[in-house]
């Protein structure tokens, strides 16, 4: 479990101290006596919420909000990306729960497939090849269970309001059934096929992978210029010593070379087309063919086609009906096609072949070269292209349909819809869903040993394992042969995790009605799919495909895409860079609520740097909230007063401003604009309520004006706690219980709504500016905040708030005026934007600076005339000084001028 001890202690001295005047406080014990100790309080509430089932889903509720949460792979410990992503999801869940929705907020573990196998091998220091399949699967289950238990504790310690009764595992029997049902349904629809064809292959994991599981990796290698003997040109036999040059980074593919290609616009090499060439070292003769896919700008412009080096090789092989020469096997070992290099790993064979080419005189040049290769995203091993038999889901014939399905969903942010569409537009392969691994969900198929016909499991049997379960028939339905061989492959993990909306909704086959049904149909389509932008092509696209094919509907109404967590230098975190920051280290130093404040610090979709300063800002907000709450608690009676028939102007104004904040923050939550909601709420609470209104309230209560102020303090305080609750669940729950002694959790109370208060907001805001200006005046002049001021003049609109300002700042005489005072404005300087001025005027910048220094310039409207040139308003800013010539000291706010006399 993540540790709950903090090296930072919350120092309460930087916010309002509770009043010492006992006449203004209740005689009962202080509900907030002492300091806030998150080290003790946060774990207590985490345990209490789970014990009380505070976040349980209510199937009988009238309104609901369903979230299709991403099941993390069980491949290690919690990282900052998890913390960030889970917290964003939790903001949504907590907000909707308080909006009177019952929230379906499940948690899943994607614990089948390659990630689980590699974790098991790493943890136990074993290889899956060294164990019988069943035994290795059991080891995977044991290791995954251990990590899942630890992971669950870690997620709970982040205050994520998961309903833990709705937890699923993708390897569990009920999920296996859903996955196998999906396979059978798509097969019956004609959307699946089995084919022996070129496949993207990971030699390290020894399995086929899909296009989506590849990623680019920069690699430093050698570009080798190799001489091929020309046997014939397109016009007849070639000269005895005629050669041409092929440039390649992969000479180990020479034994797999089956053709040479020239671009039809390559005039210099057109004479080769129709002829043939001999491959050095391996001596096979291959044809020279014209094809427009040749890149004339790379290397010599003449390209060898090998089976297979890349996607182009596959396309040429298919388009020109070329022979098949497989020189590399499933473990990246050279085959007998490679002759004397058989048994070597490809990297070893590459060096040996280069050396032999050099000795033979066929290696013309070998030079350094940086290029991009395709690697498996799980292990970063460079992929190969092998011919294997695999199961596929058809995608390419419905690309436009899947794009249109994406347009039926609301995207937050909108720009991520474009990324989804671009991925589909760039698809070149159908989805390979079979994997040659030990741990995974079995493909429910047997094959006839005679005719090869696939025999599908019956729906009632599922889940099945063909390796241990009997087939549904005794003989092949196609030819009658009585020998059936079980499928050994398992599903790609994404073939199962793409079904999470159906898993959570309880999708199943009903034999009585002979149709698919859902146990919780009210959940589907889900209201929200939250996830990172890095798995749009993995999880989101595949979920749309599967659910759309099974139900005819898109699986969710809204999609919320978050960015990645970067380090403080805005670089991606990685073990190789040594810049990974474990959440455990962060939570040893800071409260959980402070990390949640940090997580709300950027717009969704944007990559997000980890900055310790943001956590410190969150910690300061906790201090401010605790101290302000303690002050409110001591200023107000134990029993909440009824709303008076008439509120004082300043109280009505505060509640009207709070109404506007409630409406604005609510709208931002609805649009998933958490950073804007957080910043607006913090600003109003800190600057307006704490710094301005509380000072006024203290003074008004000391003057005996209690009822209106007490009601306003409590109304505002309760509202602030509820608005902060999704961001800061621990401290708001603690304050709610201590201050209001209510039985229910703050997180199940109703979200605040507008109280319908009406006030002159402009006048009130200006009055608060005046209070701030006078407080600043006292501080700058070394005066205590309760020092008396004899005479203050305010030039600005504060009608109705004069008494509040005078009382709060101890002003004996306060005069207000609508018109501005006599102020002289002079230009004190010109500030140039050199990023624009430099490129535009070059060597003339020096003369421009000198003329400005001498005051030799003229401002004409929005332009600056100086040194014989004209600068537009984007290139400069005018600096002004303002001087008050009357009696007293002037200070200005955004909306008023204040003079202390």
UniProtKB/Swiss-Prot annotation:
GO molecular function annotation: aminoacyl-tRNA deacylase activity; ATP binding; valine-tRNA ligase activity
Region of interest (Disordered), residue spans: 1-37
Keywords, ordered alphabetically: Aminoacyl-tRNA synthetase, ATP-binding, Cytoplasm, Ligase, Nucleotide-binding, Protein biosynthesis
Localization in the cell: Cytoplasm
Main location per the UniProt record: cytoplasm
GO cellular component: cytosol
Catalytic activity line of the entry: tRNA(Val) + L-valine + ATP = L-valyl-tRNA(Val) + AMP + diphosphate
Binding-site positions, ATP: 575
Chain positions of motif 'KMSKS' region: 572-576
InterPro entries the record matches: aa-tRNA-synth_I_CS, aa-tRNA-synth_Ia, Anticodon_Ia_Val, M/V/L/I-tRNA-synth_anticd-bd, Rossmann-like_a/b/a_fold, tRNAsynth_Ia_anticodon-bd, Val/Leu/Ile-tRNA-synth_edit, Valine-tRNA_ligase_type_2
Enzyme Commission code: 6.1.1.9
Function (record text): Catalyzes the attachment of valine to tRNA(Val). As ValRS can inadvertently accommodate and process structurally similar amino acids such as threonine, to avoid such errors, it has a 'posttransfer' editing activity that hydrolyzes mischarged Thr-tRNA(Val) in a tRNA-dependent manner.
NCBIfam families found in the cross-reference section: PRK13208.1, valS
The protein's name: Valine--tRNA ligase
Species this protein is from: Haloarcula marismortui (strain ATCC 43049 / DSM 3752 / JCM 8966 / VKM B-1809)
């Amino acid at each position: 479990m993540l540790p709950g001890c903090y090296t930072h202690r919350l120092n309460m001295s930087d916010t309002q101290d509770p009043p010492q005047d006992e006449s203004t406080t209740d005689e009962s014990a202080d509900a907030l006596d002492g300091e806030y100790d998150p080290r003790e309080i946060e774990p207590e509430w985490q345990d209490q919420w789970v014990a009380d089932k505070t976040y349980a889903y209510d199937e009988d509720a009238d309104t609901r909000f369903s979230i299709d949460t991403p099941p993390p792979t069980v491949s290690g410990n919690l990282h900052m990306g998890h913390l960030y992503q889970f917290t964003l999801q939790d903001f949504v869940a907590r907000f909707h729960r308080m909006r009177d929705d019952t929230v379906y907020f499940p948690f899943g573990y994607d614990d089948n497939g390659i990630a689980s196998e590699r974790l098991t091998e790493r943890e136990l220091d074993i290889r899956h090849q060294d164990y019988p399949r069943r035994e290795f699967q059991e080891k995977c289950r044991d290791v995954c269970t251990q990590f899942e238990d630890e992971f669950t504790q870690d997620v709970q310690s982040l205050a994520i309001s998961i309903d833990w009764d709705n937890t699923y595992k993708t390897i569990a029997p009920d999920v296996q059934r859903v996955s196998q049902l999906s396979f059978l349904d798509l097969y019956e629809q004609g959307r699946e096929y089995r084919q022996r064809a070129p496949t993207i292959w990971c030699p390290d994991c020894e399995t086929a992978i899909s296009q989506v599981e590849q990623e680019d990796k920069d690699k430093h290698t050698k570009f080798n210029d190799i001489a091929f003997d020309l046997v014939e040109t397109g016009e007849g036999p070639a000269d005895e010593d005629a050669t041409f040059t092929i440039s390649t980074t992969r000479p180990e593919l020479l034994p797999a070379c089956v053709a040479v290609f020239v671009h039809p616009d390559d005039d210099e090499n057109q004479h080769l087309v129709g002829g043939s060439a001999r491959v050095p070292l391996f001596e096979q003769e291959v044809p020279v063919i014209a094809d427009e896919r040749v890149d004339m700008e790379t290397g010599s412009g003449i390209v060898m086609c090998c089976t297979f080096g890349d996607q182009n090789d596959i396309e040429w092989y298919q388009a020109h009906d070329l022979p098949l020469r497989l020189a590399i096997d499933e473990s990246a070992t050279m085959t007998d096609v490679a002759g004397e290099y058989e048994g070597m790993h490809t990297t070893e064979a590459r060096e040996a072949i280069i050396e032999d080419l050099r000795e033979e005189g066929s290696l013309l040049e070998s030079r350094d070269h940086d290029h991009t290769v395709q690697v498996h995203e799980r292990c970063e091993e460079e992929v190969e292209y092998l011919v294997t038999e695999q199961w596929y889901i058809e995608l390419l014939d419905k690309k436009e349909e899947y794009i249109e399905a994406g347009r039926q969903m609301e995207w937050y942010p909108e720009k991520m819809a474009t990324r989804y569409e671009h991925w589909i537009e760039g698809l070149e392969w159908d989805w390979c869903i079979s994997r040659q691994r030990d741990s995974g969900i079995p493909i429910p198929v047997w094959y006839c040993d005679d005719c090869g016909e696939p025999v599908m499991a019956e729906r009632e049997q599922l889940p099945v394992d063909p390796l241990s379960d009997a087939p549904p028939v005794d003989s092949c339905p196609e030819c009658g042969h009585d020998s059936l061989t079980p499928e050994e492959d398992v599903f790609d993990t994404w073939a199962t995790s793409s079904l999470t909306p159906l898993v959570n909704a309880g999708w199943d086959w009903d034999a009585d009605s002979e149709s698919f049904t859902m146990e919780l149909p009210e959940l589907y389509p889900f209201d929200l799919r939250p996830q990172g932008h890095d798995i749009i092509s993995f999880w989101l696209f595949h979920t749309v495909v599967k659910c759309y094919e099974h139900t005819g509907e898109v699986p969710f109404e809204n999609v919320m895409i978050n960015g990645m967590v970067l380090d403080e230098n805005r670089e991606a975190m990685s073990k190789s860079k040594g810049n990974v920051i474990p959440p455990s280290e962060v939570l040893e130093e800071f409260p959980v609520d402070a990390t949640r404040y940090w997580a709300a610090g950027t717009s969704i979709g944007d990559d997000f740097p980890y900055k310790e300063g943001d956590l410190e800002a969150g910690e300061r907000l906790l201090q401010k909230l605790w101290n302000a709450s303690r002050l409110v608690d001591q200023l107000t009676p134990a029993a909440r007063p009824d709303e008076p028939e008439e509120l004082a102007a300043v109280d009505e104004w505060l509640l009207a401003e709070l109404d506007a904040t409630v409406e604005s923050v609510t709208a931002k939550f609805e649009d998933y604009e958490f950073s804007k909601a957080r910043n607006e709420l913090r600003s109003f609470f800190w600057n307006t309520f704490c710094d301005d209104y509380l000072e006024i309230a203290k003074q008004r209560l000391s003057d005996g004006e209690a009822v209106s102020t007490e009601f306003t303090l409590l109304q505002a305080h309760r509202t602030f706690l509820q608005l902060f609750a999704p961001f800061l669940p621990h401290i708001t729950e603690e304050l709610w219980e201590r201050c209001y002694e209510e039985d229910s959790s703050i997180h199940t109370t109703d979200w605040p709504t507008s109280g319908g208060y009406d006030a002159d907001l402009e006048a009130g805001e200006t009055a608060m500016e005046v209070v701030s200006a006078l407080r600043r005046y006292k501080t700058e002049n070394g005066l205590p905040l309760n020092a008396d001021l004899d005479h203050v003049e305010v030039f600005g609109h504060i009608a109705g708030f004069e008494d509040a300002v005078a009382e709060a700042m101890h002003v004996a005489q306060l005069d207000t005026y609508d018109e501005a005072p006599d102020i002289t404005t002079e230009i004190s300087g010109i500030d140039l934007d050199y990023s624009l001025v430099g490129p535009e005027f070059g060597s003339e910048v020096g003369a421009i600076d000198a003329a400005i220094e001498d005051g030799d310039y003229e401002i004409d409207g929005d332009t600056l005339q100086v040194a014989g040139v004209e600068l537009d308003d984007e290139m400069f800013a005018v600096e002004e000084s303002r001087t008050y010539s009357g009696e007293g000291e002037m200070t200005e706010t955004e909306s008023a001028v204040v003079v202390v006399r």
